[in-house]
């Protein structure tokens, strides 16, 4: 079996029983289970959810996305070996640690396979909860243009690139395009302030004003848990994006939970500590791949300018990236995952068939 066969690229064509269209995102696909299968699994597996809670199978792929495009490699290597397994393993580790520390639960109920989660349907909070400990990336680019206020927070003069900020900053943005909210532009991924969210509690899908405090608390505490754990491996947790939502437990009590993924190389910037002390930035996240793309193509503006999306999509479609680049990404993701979980990562030899076999034999979900 060659390298390309070990990569799960297409993850929305599995024969999982569902009565709804499969939702296929950039990296994950979601299969909503039938009410009958959801109820059966809740009863048989003892999940702490209402008996009629909708469940889904969430399958992560090994695809690599950046700048809103999915990128492919040479020689049929259309994904990054081990990437999906690494992302899930990292999130699983942090979600477990959050629960042990008494923070909050996640949407994950079961992990049948390294690439698969069984999740409870959540009502998402409509913000990307972003926390920043260092000034870098888009924030630094805006700072160099004279901006000093970010999401209603004023930061001091005289900061330098990649410098640690005086305190952890919460700089949320909209999740999707929100309409009819005064003062909030109707566009995807727009920065919003705490006061914007307070004015539109319902519009951002919060159940109460006090839950705004709770999400900020869970964001800060989750950031600190991950930052402290990574510091033990001399890795710096630079910034990250969390997502939150609401679910009900078996007793019908609503609770705010972590959802999607947390503390991964896809959703965070992670730097090597020793290199940073020497004044160099070694990325241990997808940011390294983003920088490679910006340096690789002659006209980097295509990747940064949202008015050139058609050109950007064509660029990603027409250019096969060197296999060595895909393997460098693999080494980064697998390497940071093994540091986080403290053991060697098991990479599937035939991921698609393994998933089908386990969902058939242990969960009776294959048609």
UniProtKB/Swiss-Prot annotation:
Keywords: ATP-binding, Ligase, Nucleotide-binding, Purine biosynthesis
SUPFAM superfamilies reported in the protein's UniProt record: SAICAR synthase-like
EC number: 6.3.2.6
Origin superkingdom: Bacteria
Recorded metabolic or biological pathway in which this protein acts: Purine metabolism; IMP biosynthesis via de novo pathway; 5-amino-1-(5-phospho-D-ribosyl)imidazole-4-carboxamide from 5-amino-1-(5-phospho-D-ribosyl)imidazole-4-carboxylate: step 1/2
Catalytic activity annotation: 5-amino-1-(5-phospho-D-ribosyl)imidazole-4-carboxylate + L-aspartate + ATP = (2S)-2-[5-amino-1-(5-phospho-beta-D-ribosyl)imidazole-4-carboxamido]succinate + ADP + phosphate + 2 H(+)
GO biological process: 'de novo' IMP biosynthetic process
Any single Gene Ontology cellular-component annotation: cytoplasm
GO molecular function, one term: ATP binding
Pfam families: SAICAR_synt
UniProt-listed InterPro entries: SAICAR_synt/ADE2_N (IPR028923), SAICAR_synthase_Vibrio-typ (IPR014106)
Family membership noted in the UniProt record: Belongs to the SAICAR synthetase family.
NCBIfam families, per the entry: PRK13960.1, purC_vibrio
Protein name per UniProt: Phosphoribosylaminoimidazole-succinocarboxamide synthase
UniProt source species: Shewanella piezotolerans (strain WP3 / JCM 13877)
